[in-house]
Design a protein with these regions (language model features):
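Helix-rich effector regions associated with P-loop NTPase G domains
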Residues: 1-20, 41-44, 77-80, 84-88, ...
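Structural detector for short beta-strands of small beta-barrel domains
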Residues: 43-54
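Conserved beta-strand segments of the P-loop GTPase G domain that flank and frequently precede/overlap
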Residues: 122-126, 153-155
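Canonical P-loop GTPase G-domain recognition
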Residues: 149, 156-211
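Beta-strand/loop nucleic-acid-binding surfaces
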Residues: 63-77
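Short, charged beta-turn/beta-strand-edge "cap" motif at the junction between a beta-strand
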Residues: 85-90, 127-129, 209
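A conserved segment at the C-terminal end of the G1
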Residues: 213-229
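Short aromatic-glycine-enriched beta-strand elements
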Residues: 56-60
Length: 358
């Protein structure tokens, strides 16, 4: 005798809830964001994620939502909003679990937000003249500071003659950072990145132009949704194909951020990131006689002692000192700028308040 299971069938409301949860998970929604909202809020203000930032508009996506809305202040790709349907400009920005940023290029020293709420940063470099340990160290420090897992991805191994040398140099940067070498055009490349590209995860491809970031995103997607270009044969330099940061949802349920190449990567507010990237040098620093030791000619300098004994690589130490000095300088400059802007905004509010009283 067959049991009547009709009562066990999910209702339309249950199906809708499950579909909504699945769509949000694929966009990167998880426990960190659930903890910030009440169920009653979601009825009026559904969660949406910023997938692209344009000059005057934002592209947002959510459960059964795909819209362009007016720009908001201080938001970036990857941010989550509680969307205000009646007044999009009043949408609430949820607290970020991570934020990648840099000092904006040029003379106007501003802070530039790169991406929010990432889980993993794939730092991509070609096995050719583009390869730079110094650049990789910058990206790794930036990722560590944001509490994002950095992974070095070496591409174009099919064209390289000395792959082992590139891999060895990449692994020497930090014992805490995984190194993967692959051919970005090979369909099997996605299997090397699979452990970081699980459903609900958000990953980003960072690196110079022409290293294969968009190609890797296409490989993960299983199609050519993102335009790519070849590098110049003369110097292995890439051409800008991706002109803006855009979040793509993969068939696997992973959100992938493709970014344009960054010619300049000035660090700011990354003291902890530098400590983690250069953990061995930071540990030595604690043993110096003076807290403000410049590791040059000061007495009882633990770093100089390690250099003399051959335990420390001199070029690496010099890069570390350069990055520490750069971070201190940029952090001070941007802090002063924030104070000026805060004071300016306060004065504007005060003037408006007095005007209303009149």
């Amino acid at each position: 005798m067959l049991r009547d299971m009709s009562h066990a069938k999910p209702t339309d409301d249950t199906i809708a809830i499950l579909e909504t949860a699945s769509q949000l998970r694929n966009l990167g929604w998880g426990a960190y964001f659930w903890d910030q909202v009440e169920a009653t809020e979601l009825e009026q203000s559904p969660p949406v994620r910023i997938t692209q930032v344009h000059r005057n508009t934002l592209h947002i996506q959510g459960a059964n939502l795909d819209l362009m809305i007016p720009s908001l202040h201080d938001v970036t790709v990857g941010d989550w909003l509680l969307f205000n349907r009646e007044d999009p400009r009043s949408s609430q920005l949820l607290e970020r679990k991570s934020l990648i940023k840099r000092r904006a290029p040029g003379h106007d020293r501003k802070e530039q937000l790169i991406a929010a709420n990432l889980d993993t940063a794939f730092i991509v470099s070609s096995c050719n003249n583009d390869f730079s340990v110094a650049r990789l160290e910058r990206y790794i420090a930036m990722a560590h500071e944001a509490d994002v897992t950095p992974v070095i991805v070496l591409t174009k191994i099919d064209l390289a003659k000395n792959i082992v040398e590139f891999v060895s140099k990449a692994k020497a940067i930090s014992k805490r950072v995984a190194v993967v070498s692959l051919n970005a055009r090979d369909p099997s490349a996605s299997s090397y990145l699979f452990q970081w590209c699980q459903p609900g995860q958000t990953v980003a491809f960072l690196g110079s132009s022409g290293v294969g970031k968009s190609t890797l995103a296409n490989t993960l997607a299983g199609n050519e949704t993102i335009e790519t270009q070849e590098v110049r044969a003369s110097d292995d330099k890439g051409r800008h194909t991706t002109t803006g940061r855009q979040l793509h949802i993969m068939p696997s349920g992973c959100a992938v951020l493709d970014t344009p190449g960054m010619r300049e990567l000035q660090l700011t507010d990354v003291s902890i990131g530098l400590e983690e990237t250069f953990a061995d040098l930071h540990a030595l620093r604690q043993n110096c006689r003076f807290n403000d030791c410049a590791h040059d000619k000061e007495p009882d300098c633990a770093v100089q002692a390690a250099i003399t004994s051959g335990k420390v690589d001199v070029p690496r130490m010099q890069r570390w000192l350069k990055l520490v000095a750069e971070d201190v300088e940029n952090t001070k400059i941007l802090a002063k700028r924030r104070m000026r802007e805060k004071s300016k905004n306060k004065n504007v509010k005060s003037v408006r308040k007095h005007s209303l009283k009149k």
